[in-house]
Amino acid sequence: MELIVYIIVLAFFFELMDSSAGMGFGTGLTPLLLLMGYEPLQVVPILLISEAVTGFTAGIFHHEFENVDFSFSKKMSTEMRITLMITAFGCFAIFFSVILTYFALKIPTDMVKTYVAILVLAMGLIAILRFKKTSSVYRPKLLFGFAALAGFNKGIGGGGYGPVVMLGQLLSGIYEKSATAIVSLAEGMVSILGFASFLLISTYGVSIDYVLLPSIFTGGFIAAIISPYMVRVVPNNFWKICIPIYALCIGVFTLSNVYL
């Protein structure tokens, strides 16, 4: 396995956006890699390995830069409880989707991409319409469905997790900077089980190719260290409008890769 420079650059860019805006690594990088001729089993498991490490790394630095409170001291913080809840539902869904997609039904990739893109576009539009509200009602119960849906997306195509959980948090009334940190850590934990699911089906003859691992991991890890500082210093109002607009771009980009 060797380092591929342009893959490192792409991984760095998409992870920088992912750990800063809560989305984009798998959703943006997967279609590009498939267009370059790589197979899903060369891409999806590797993205899950990388996201497992970068998610934890970004989560630690988000905590250090005080974008979020992940403390366990005396009483578990609200943010940590939300993270664990999102993770629990996401883990169940990602295990189910990996088995269903790559071992049982083998759902067509284009169908999955179209579904994820339309979902992200719809949620991005809702988040933009919500922007004019000065305050949001905290509704944590909404997160159960978003977390399960995001985990299902992640297992199918390696992407579609961040946009759903991130926008789901915003629609549930969670502060933008905290939401970005929460999705990073939750995605890291969910990705561990996702990769473990691929290891399980590999024992039944499904082959995993690790050729992209060094390049994707290198670019992603560097970005995961830098991005929490960006979240810390950039005003929250910027993220409030940037995140849904970026989601719309991700949705349009994904659809264009499928149909153009």
Positions of predicted regions on the chain:
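Residue-level signal for conserved functional micro-sites within the alpha-helical transmembrane segments
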Residues: 54, 194, 220
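Transmembrane helix-bundle signature of multi-pass membrane transporters/permeases
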Residues: 12-15, 44-52, 180-190, 247
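Small-residue-rich midsections of specific transmembrane alpha-helices
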Residues: 50-60
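Transmembrane helix boundary and interhelical junction motifs in multipass membrane proteins
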Residues: 21-29, 157-166
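Juxtamembrane transmembrane-helix boundary motif
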Residues: 1-19, 28-42, 59-155, 170, ...
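Helix N-cap / loop-to-helix initiation motif
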Residues: 38-40, 174-179
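Alpha-helical transmembrane segments of helical membrane proteins, especially in multi-pass transport
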Residues: 188-201
